[in-house]
């Protein structure tokens, strides 16, 4: 079970949002690169970056801190990024800069042809972020709920050749209310590619619950508010996940 610290970037700072609301942000660090080094020192095996301003603008908006993060971690661990990725040029620039995986969210739902092209151009490096509430996919920073069924879209995107899916239960994200294991497992059983859980992870019991379904295809989790506010000790959580995998 791969536990991945999230670094959400807004105006050059590391923040956490509640329910995806840009106006409800808690600043956790003025120095995102130092935060990246902190998670690396604690044994993180991958980092998850989100350009929140970019997600709104539809193009990269936190390039300086992203570059600083990549310099801080070097080649030690892979870094994945999402937020505002709408064209192949942006993907290419990120990969050339040292990003390992690019996450496509809203653009994958609105423009499946773009996702298909991206998977073809950059095989093994495209992850899809699917945000859902009650089984329906949301787009545009969660502001719009579509009629798309999350399971149907996941299968379609797998067929396009995406590397993995990050599934966020948007009713729980940033709320520390517990991960939606059932919905995550349903999705993981529906596809053959890895699924990463996101949203609501509050403590060690959530990690243990996800470890119990790792064989169903839930291969990791994105950790946010819980590790920033101290509800979850990252090092202890990864150690426990490794122990349960034996």
Swiss-Prot record:
GO terms for molecular function: 1-(5-phosphoribosyl)-5-[(5-phosphoribosylamino)methylideneamino]imidazole-4-carboxamide isomerase activity. Its EC number is 5.3.1.16. GO terms for biological process: L-histidine biosynthetic process; L-tryptophan biosynthetic process. Its main location: cytoplasm. It holds the Pfam family His_biosynth. It is an enzyme of class 5 (isomerase). Keywords: Amino-acid biosynthesis, Cytoplasm, Histidine biosynthesis, Isomerase. It is found in: Cytoplasm. One of its GO terms (cellular component) is cytoplasm. The keyword Amino-acid biosynthesis applies. The keyword Amino-acid biosynthesis applies. Pathway: Amino-acid biosynthesis; L-histidine biosynthesis; L-histidine from 5-phospho-alpha-D-ribose 1-diphosphate: step 4/9. The active site is at residues 8, 131. Gene3D superfamilies: Aldolase class I. SUPFAM superfamilies: Ribulose-phoshate binding barrel. It catalyses: 1-(5-phospho-beta-D-ribosyl)-5-[(5-phospho-beta-D-ribosylamino)methylideneamino]imidazole-4-carboxamide = 5-[(5-phospho-1-deoxy-D-ribulos-1-ylimino)methylamino]-1-(5-phospho-beta-D-ribosyl)imidazole-4-carboxamide. Belongs to the HisA/HisF family. This is 1-(5-phosphoribosyl)-5-[(5-phosphoribosylamino)methylideneamino] imidazole-4-carboxamide isomerase. It comes from Bordetella pertussis (strain Tohama I / ATCC BAA-589 / NCTC 13251). The gene is hisA.
């Amino acid at each position: 079970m791969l536990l991945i610290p999230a670094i959400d970037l807004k105006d050059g700072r590391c923040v956490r949002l509640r329910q995806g609301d840009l106006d409800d942000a808690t600043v956790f660090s003025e120095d995102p690169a130092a935060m990246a080094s902190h998670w690396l020192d604690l044994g993180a095996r991958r980092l998850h970056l989100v350009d929140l301003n970019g997600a709104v603008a539809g193009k990269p908006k936190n390039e300086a801190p992203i570059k600083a993060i990549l310099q801080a971690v070097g080649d030690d661990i892979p870094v994945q990024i999402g937020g505002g990725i709408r064209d192949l040029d942006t993907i290419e620039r990120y990969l050339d800069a040292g990003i390992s995986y690019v996450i496509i969210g809203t653009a994958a739902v609105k423009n499946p042809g773009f996702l298909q092209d991206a998977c073809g151009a950059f095989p093994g490096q495209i992850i899809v972020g699917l945000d859902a509430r009650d089984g329906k996919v949301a787009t545009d920073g969660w502001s719009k709920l579509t009629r798309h069924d999350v399971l149907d879209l996941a299968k379609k995107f797998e067929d396009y050749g995406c590397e993995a899916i990050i599934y966020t239960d948007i009713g729980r994200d940033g709320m520390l209310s517990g991960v939606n294991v059932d919905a995550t497992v349903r999705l993981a059983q529906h596809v053959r590619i890895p699924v990463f859980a996101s949203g609501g992870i509050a403590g060690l019991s959530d990690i243990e619950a996800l470890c119990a379904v790792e064989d169903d295809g839930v291969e990791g989790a994105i950790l946010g508010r819980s590790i920033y506010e101290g509800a979850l000790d990252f090092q202890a959580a990864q150690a426990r996940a490794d122990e349960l995998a034996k």
